[in-house]
Amino acid sequence: MIDSLTALQRWYESRCDGVWEHAHGIEVVTLDNPGWKVKLDGATSGKVIDLSIERDESDWISVRATSAEFAGYGGPGNLPELLALAVEWIDWRATNDEGRSDR
């Protein structure tokens, strides 16, 4: 089993074709509240996700994903959880994309 960063790296690399990467990609940034934002776009047939969990003021996640875009937000300690959810979105898409594999 590969870690989340490796899975995201492989997904990104599999998409890069000289054109795609100029308009799409992966974004991981810090928020000023504090927290994290993880965004992936440029996919097709992704799993729709609408998830919001607030455990406490600094331990929370909010994920909205469509078939084409994943947007996840979380507290300062929730980056690994957000990355794992992004990989789940990619893996679902890879196994439900009419036999096409992104790995």
Question: What is the role of each PLM region?
Answer:
Residues 1-45:
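Negatively charged, low-complexity tracts enriched in Asp/Glu with abundant Ser/Thr
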Residues 8, 12, 49, 82-86:
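Generic structural signal of hydrophobic/aromatic residues within well-ordered alpha-helices
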Residues 37-62:
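A short, structured beta-strand/loop element
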Residues 54-101:
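Helix-rich interaction surfaces within compact, conserved domain-sized segments
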